[in-house]
Amino acid sequence: MIKLERVYFNYKTMPMNFNIHIKPQERVAIIGASGAGKSTLLNLIAGFERADDGEIWLNGVNHTYTEPYERPVSMLFQENNLFTHLTVEQNIALGLKPDLKLSAAEQSLVRQTASAVGLSRFLDRKPTALSGGQKQRVALARCLLRDKPILLLDEPFSALDPALRAEMLDLLSQLCNEKKLTLLIVTHQPSELQGRIDRILTVENGHFAKNNDLK
């Protein structure tokens, strides 16, 4: 569950105001022109930006002033932020232990998560040996390994070709079902999400301008 109550953020020359309630396990797309406030909205929810006023509730808890690591949120960007000197398995494991000192049970969990996104055969490879789609699978697996109930995606697949985007969106839908995730995804291709999301929110000039319920 995501609830923003009169959240105000004084962003440079465009003050932002957000009010929204997203139900548990709901899947919502965020659209709008560049600079409208879409990424800032996700950063406020994740805690990378601090609201100047209002409240941010996540899964029934007030997280307005908590640190990003304390919030029940994982976030995936267009830039997958993989470390080229680490293997696929190690890059995924960072989501669990930044020092990579894993127990046998944790190592097993990393491999299970890699398998869930179709990476079992690539665990020993470095990111430089992967395709764009495979790199995003690694980043997605790292997010999932954190086992947070809310997943925020900021145009994560926009650099991929249409066929790969469709493949990743199908995988995302499957994982949301299996893990009962609440999803918020920023996109410039909302038509590709038809049948995969519950509603579309349009952001204009730092506020929600339209709420299109698809179900």
UniProtKB/Swiss-Prot annotation:
Main localization (coarse): membrane
Functional note: Part of the ABC transporter complex ThiBPQ involved in thiamine import. Responsible for energy coupling to the transport system.
One example GO MF annotation: ATP binding
Location in or out of the cell: Cell inner membrane
Recorded topology in the membrane: Peripheral membrane protein
E.C. number: 7.6.2.15
Subunit composition and interactions: The complex is composed of two ATP-binding proteins (ThiQ), two transmembrane proteins (ThiP) and a solute-binding protein (ThiB).
Residues of the ABC transporter domain: 2-214
Organism per entry: Mannheimia succiniciproducens (strain KCTC 0769BP / MBEL55E)
Name recorded for this polypeptide: Thiamine import ATP-binding protein ThiQ
One Pfam family cited in the UniProt record for this chain: ABC_tran
Keyword list, A-Z: ATP-binding, Cell inner membrane, Cell membrane, Membrane, Nucleotide-binding, Translocase, Transport
Family indicated by similarity: Belongs to the ABC transporter superfamily. Thiamine importer (TC 3.A.1.19.1) family.
Manganese keyword on record: no
